[in-house]
Structures are given as structure tokens and as C-alpha cells.
From Swiss-Prot:
<dbReference type="GO" id="GO:0043066">
    <property type="term" value="P:negative regulation of apoptotic process"/>
</dbReference>
<dbReference type="GO" id="GO:0005524">
    <property type="term" value="F:ATP binding"/>
</dbReference>
<keyword id="KW-0553">Oncogene</keyword>
<dbReference type="Pfam" id="PF21314">
    <property type="entry name" value="TM_ErbB1"/>
</dbReference>
<comment type="similarity">
    <text>Belongs to the protein kinase superfamily. Tyr protein kinase family. EGF receptor subfamily.</text>
</comment>
<keyword id="KW-0418">Kinase</keyword>
<keyword id="KW-0829">Tyrosine-protein kinase</keyword>
<protein>
    <recommendedName>
        <fullName>Tyrosine-protein kinase transforming protein erbB</fullName>
        <ecNumber>2.7.10.1</ecNumber>
    </recommendedName>
</protein>
<dbReference type="InterPro" id="IPR032778">
    <property type="entry name" value="GF_recep_IV"/>
</dbReference>
<dbReference type="Pfam" id="PF14843">
    <property type="entry name" value="GF_recep_IV"/>
</dbReference>
<feature type="binding site">
    <location>
        <begin position="138"/>
        <end position="146"/>
    </location>
    <ligand>
        <name>ATP</name>
    </ligand>
</feature>
<dbReference type="GO" id="GO:0048408">
    <property type="term" value="F:epidermal growth factor binding"/>
</dbReference>
<dbReference type="InterPro" id="IPR011009">
    <property type="entry name" value="Kinase-like_dom_sf"/>
</dbReference>
<dbReference type="InterPro" id="IPR001245">
    <property type="entry name" value="Ser-Thr/Tyr_kinase_cat_dom"/>
</dbReference>
<dbReference type="InterPro" id="IPR020635">
    <property type="entry name" value="Tyr_kinase_cat_dom"/>
</dbReference>
<feature type="binding site">
    <location>
        <position position="165"/>
    </location>
    <ligand>
        <name>ATP</name>
    </ligand>
</feature>
<dbReference type="GO" id="GO:0043235">
    <property type="term" value="C:receptor complex"/>
</dbReference>
Length: 634
């Protein structure tokens, strides 16, 4: 008979005895061998065994050692933590006592909050009123007056032509703040393609002294010389404007008012961006600026700026596209015939400015990219510089202008303004501002160097108002009856140079959207939406009674005029004539390029006539109607 489990002597057991009390009160420990027979463990095995001898005895438990190690480690951590806490506490107490001592010694110590921005090391020159002389009035408005003048630095025998912008005596604190903000922005820039501030005079009325641009603004310049401007000039201007705007973007400045009227011509080869009355400086962590109101140029603004008053560097790109369109159409008005209040809906429906007749698809596509609804889809200014620089190396490939290779700008010495300048002042020792300031980057006390007189270096100034976009003939554009060359080509592949002059030339249109005589012409715009009646017909149209300020000398585009004026405001406008000394003709403050209540289907009555001090900070379009900035409802 065999046991089912183990054999312990004569007995069958389920398990070998383990710790059973035996003889002499000793514990008996047994283990099962290979035959399932219980055998006694070695006498020294006091906790059982797994085999014969001492080798079968179990090892001692490691649990106490592990527990001891864990407890010891925790104690060490607690001690180290207490030590660190005491150290930090003592350091905090020392710092607190130090700050308390500094506060007692210096009365106030502001906490340090570094922004990471580079310091603005621009110099603001404070000029004495005796250092400059006002020569003649260039223009005036509700905010003040702009003079042509001469800056004669103290202790030097040079004269620098300048424009002096002076606020009125009874100017509001807000207007003073706006002109000082403008001075801050202009003093912070230093670029060949951005107009610079020469100084500020803090008399009873604040005065800004800026560079005087002898050729006036670019809009006026291209309108006057449209028959002599070739493709190379147009593309070079596009490059220079893009360079100026790229510089402003690098300085985190949003211009908000880029247009051809706000680009000044120093020489036909050199243009500069001006009018920083609306410009805003973004902080290091800001990417957009939210405007609260003010006068805004609706037809040059991006859609997000019109609808939400959001201004970014990419909204400046949109304005740049419209500015390029102005250049390529030789001063045409964007969206002519469309009321400013409808611009947002027109843009939302996908309509854009038409392709100028002289532009190839390459140039027009750049404009279209600038007018994308998605701001991030628009090109950057550095990309625009690269594109137009490439085109400027081969102008006839991208702009098709008849007789392009024979075009040259007329001698500026024939201009009326140049002759007036010569007659009015002793022009000896006249020096250009840029040339004068080169050796004076530090300040005014550096020694004078040899300079080239302005009259010999600048062969002239234009017959424009020196710093203003003048609307000639009271129409906002010149009338050139002797223009006989058909300059526009709708088909870039056509060889119009082979046509004979004797075949009969039609007068070139003054604007792309102007109707031509009965004979078909390639100068007509293909998009009929923008076609307009002839210049003569425009001047004969009666003003719509729905709009205010309908002077005979006002801009004949009533849909742009401010309808949100109280009777008081209307009376002030209609009874406030402004005169230009040179032309002696009356003008109006209304300007169609800027509107007040530009949000769709929204009008809020405003009983106050408000023309901000920054209406045109640089040169104030002298003969141009002055409603270009119409107040935007907050």
C-alpha cells in the first residue's frame, strides 16, 4: 500500500512536519526527499529546510534591511529639504531687507520687467523759432497751417528748405497729443525711402519741421507727367515704396494711410513715404492694432480694416497694391463711381480694381495677391521688393507703354514753382536736408563739411506745390489738351511702334476709366464697371442733393462726401474758405478719399466738426479738397 502524499515514519501525511513540537520541547522541521519521505532538517535549521545539511536552510529575510534603507533615505531627504528651505528663506529675508533699505534711501524702486525690445535711440531735435524762417503758406486746414520755409541752423551758414506744420492757437489737447505722436513716429525712422523729421519747435503752438520735397507728391507728379513717364520709372518707384514699407515693418510701424498722395518725390529717381498721422507703433507682443475711430481712406483699406478696424502690416500690403494700381493708371481714382459706403460689400463679393492697360499679367497678379481676403495669403514687403526688383531690370517685358524707349521727363527748371522759389528768397548756400544731416548724425555741433548747393545738385523743383498734391483746374486732375500720343496698349503683343504718326492719333485719356471719342481706342478699360463719363461731362453734372458740401470747387464725387454732419458742421465747412497764395483760388476741406462712417449700413449722428491734427502731417495737399479724412464712428 502506497501513501498518496508523503511518508512520515509509519504514517502517511499530507505534508511533512514543519515546526511541530517534539521531544524535549524542541521544534521538529522535516523536508520531503525525492521519494516523498519526510527527513529531519539539520539541527541548525530553525526555520525549516529544503534539503539535507546547512545548504537546505533558508536565507534570512531582506525586508528589515530594505525598510531601514527606505526610512534612512526619507530622513536624508527631509534634512536636505529643510536645509534648502532655510537657505531660501534666509535669502528672501536678505533680499527683502535690501529692498527695504533701497526704498528708504531712494524712496521708490520700480520692479524690473524687461521687455526685450531694443532701445529707441532716435534724436528729437528741439529747434528755436529763430532758427527757421517761414517763406509762404503752402496750405491750411482746420488743424493749422503748413508753410514753406528755410531752416538756418544756429552758427552755420547754410539754408535748408523745409516744410513747417504749425497748429492753430486754440488747438485741443487731443490735437497736440496727435501731432506729438506723429513727431515721435517720424523721429524714430531713418531710411532713404521714408521722410524724416528734422525737428520740433515748442512755442505757444507746436510746430513740426520736415523735409521739403521739391517735386511734390507722387500722385500729382504722375498725373502731370503721364505722357513722359516710362516703365523703368514706374517699376523703380514700386521698388522704393516697398523698401520704405519693409523698413517700417521691421520697426513694427503700421502706416495705415499708404497711397500715392502720401509718397513724395525728392527727385524723379527717388521717392519717400510720408504722412505718419495715422501710423501706429506695435509693441513687442502685438501683431495688430485696433482703431477706435478717426478719418480713414476707405478705398485704400483692407477689408478687415473697413469691417473691424484691424490694422496690421498685411493691411498695409493691401494699400500698397492700390498704390501700385494708382501708379500704373497714371493717377486714376480707385473704385471711381462707387460710393465709399459700398466698398466693403463690393470687396466681399470678390470685385477688385481692373487690370491697368499697360500692365502685363505678371504685374497685375502681384496686385491681386495684395488684395486677398486672407491677410496671411498676401505677400510680405520683402517679397514685393524681390518681385519688383526683378521686373525693374527688364521693364519693357512687364509694362507695355508706347514709345517707352523715347520717353524722358521734362527739364524741371521750366516749373513755375522753381521760378517762384528763385524769386522769393536768396537761394545762396541752400543745402539739401539729407546732405546736411549726414555729418550731423551726432548733433549740431560737429564741424561743417563741404556740401553741394541744392540748386546745383537738384536741377529743379516741380511746378507742383512743394509738398502737396494739388488738384488742378478744381477737378482733382490735370487737363492736358496737347496729349496726342496713344500710350496705352491692351495687347502687349501688338507692335504699335510700326504705326505711322500720320495715321491720326487720338488724345490719350487722362484716366483709364475715362471715355474716349467715338473712334475705338486701346486705352479703354476692359471692365465696364469702372468706365466713367468724360472729363467735360463730369464737370457739368449737378451735385446730388443728398450730399453736403457741394461747392463748385469741391471734388465732383458726391458719393464720398460726409453725410453725417450736423447743420453746424455744414455751416462751418461752407463758410471756411482756404486760399492758396500762388493760385488764389478757393478750395474746400472735403476730400473724397477719406470717409467718416464707413461701416456698412451704419450711421451715427455727430454734431461736432472734427478734423484731427494729423490730417496730413507732411504737406497737406494744398489745393486738394480737405475731406480726405472723414471721421469714422467709434
Amino acid at each position: 500500500m502506497k501513501c498518496a502524499h508523503f511518508i512520515d515514519g509509519p504514517h502517511c501525511v499530507k505534508a511533512c512536519p514543519a515546526g511541530v513540537l517534539g521531544e524535549n520541547d524542541t521544534l521538529v522541521w522535516k523536508y520531503a526527499d525525492a521519494n516523498a519521505v519526510c527527513q529531519l532538517c539539520h539541527p541548525n535549521c530553525t526555520r525549516g529546510c529544503k534539503g539535507p545539511g546547512l545548504e537546505g536552510c533558508p536565507n534570512g529575510s531582506k525586508t528589515p534591511s530594505i525598510a531601514a534603507g527606505v526610512v534612512g533615505g526619507l530622513l536624508c531627504l527631509v534634512v536636505v529639504g529643510l536645509g534648502i528651505g532655510l537657505y531660501l528663506r534666509r535669502r528672501h529675508i536678505v533680499r527683502k531687507r535690501t529692498l527695504r533699505r533701497l526704498l528708504q534711501e531712494r524712496e521708490l524702486v520700480e520692479p524690473l520687467t524687461p521687455s526685450g525690445e531694443a532701445p529707441n535711440q532716435a534724436h528729437l531735435r528741439i529747434l528755436k523759432e529763430t532758427e527757421f524762417k517761414k517763406v509762404k503758406v503752402l496750405g491750411s486746414g482746420a488743424f493749422g497751417t503748413v508753410y514753406k520755409g528755410l531752416w538756418i541752423p544756429e552758427g552755420e551758414k547754410v539754408k535748408i528748405p523745409v516744410a513747417i506744420k504749425e497748429l492753430r492757437e486754440a488747438t485741443s489737447p487731443k490735437a497736440n497729443k496727435e501731432i506729438l505722436d506723429e513727431a515721435y513716429v517720424m523721429a524714430s525712422v531713418d531710411n532713404p525711402h521714408v521722410c524724416r523729421l528734422l525737428g520740433i519747435c515748442l512755442t505757444s503752438t507746436v510746430q513740426l519741421i520736415t523735409q521739403l520735397m521739391p517735386y511734390g507728391c507722387l500722385l500729382d507728379y504722375i498725373r502731370e507727367h503721364k505722357d513722359n513717364i516710362g516703365s523703368q520709372y514706374l517699376l523703380n518707384w514700386c521698388v522704393q515704396i516697398a523698401k520704405g514699407m519693409n523698413y517700417l515693418e521691421e520697426r513694427r510701424l503700421v502706416h495705415r494711410d499708404l497711397a500715392a498722395r502720401n509718397v513724395l518725390v525728392k527727385t524723379p529717381q527717388h521717392v519717400k513715404i510720408t504722412d505718419f498721422g495715422l501710423a501706429k507703433l506695435l509693441g513687442a507682443d502685438e501683431k495688430e492694432y485696433h482703431a477706435e475711430g478717426g478719418k480713414v481712406p476707405i478705398k485704400w483699406m483692407a477689408l478687415e480694416s473697413i469691417l473691424h478696424r484691424i490694422y496690421t502690416h498685411q493691411s498695409d500690403v493691401w494699400s500698397y497694391g492700390v498704390t501700385v494700381w494708382e501708379l500704373m493708371t497714371f493717377g486714376s481714382k480707385p473704385y471711381d463711381g462707387i460710393p465709399a459706403s459700398e466698398i466693403s460689400s463690393v470687396l466681399e463679393k470678390g470685385e477688385r480694381l481692373p487690370q491697368p492697360p499697360i500692365c502685363t499679367i505678371d504685374v497685375y497678379m502681384i496686385m491681386v495677391k495684395c488684395w486677398m481676403i486672407d491677410a496671411d495669403s498676401r505677400p510680405k514687403f520683402r517679397e514685393l521688393i524681390a518681385e519688383f526688383s526683378k521686373m525693374a531690370r527688364d521693364p519693357p517685358r512687364y509694362l507695355v507703354i508706347q514709345g517707352d524707349e523715347r520717353m524722358h521727363l521734362p527739364s524741371p527748371t521750366d516749373s513755375k514753382f522753381y521760378r517762384t522759389l528763385m524769386e522769393e528768397e536768396d537761394m545762396e548756400d541752400i543745402v539739401d536736408a539729407d546732405e546736411y544731416l549726414v555729418p550731423h548724425q551726432g548733433f549740431f555741433n560737429s564741424p561743417s563739411t563741404s556740401r553741394t548747393p541744392l540748386l546745383s545738385s537738384l536741377s529743379a523743383t516741380s511746378n507742383n506745390s512743394a509738398t502737396n498734391c494739388i488738384d488742378r483746374n478744381g477737378q482733382g486732375h490735370p487737363v492736358r489738351e496737347d496729349s496726342f500720343v496713344q500710350r496705352y496698349s491692351s495687347d502687349p503683343t501688338g507692335n504699335f511702334l510700326e504705326e505711322s504718326i500720320d495715321d491720326g492719333f487720338l488724345p490719350a485719356p487722362e484716366y483709364v476709366n475715362q471715355l474716349m471719342p467715338k473712334k475705338p481706342s486701346t486705352a479703354m478699360v476692359q471692365n465696364q464697371i469702372y468706365n466713367n463719363i468724360s472729363l467735360t461731362a463730369i464737370s457739368k453734372l449737378p451735385m446730388d442733393s443728398r450730399y453736403q458740401n457741394s461747392h463748385s470747387t469741391a471734388v465732383d464725387n458726391p458719393e464720398y462726401l460726409n453725410t453725417n454732419q450736423s447743420p453746424l458742421a455744414k455751416t462751418v465747412f461752407e463758410s471756411s474758405p482756404y486760399w492758396i497764395q500762388s493760385g488764389n483760388h478757393q478750395i474746400n476741406l472735403d476730400n473724397p478719399d477719406y470717409q467718416q462712417d464707413f461701416l456698412p449700413n451704419e450711421t451715427k449722428p455727430n454734431g461736432l466738426l472734427k478734423v484731427p491734427a494729423a490730417e496730413n502731417p507732411e504737406y497737406l495737399r494744398v489745393a486738394a479738397p480737405k475731406s480726405e479724412y472723414i471721421e469714422a464712428s467709434a
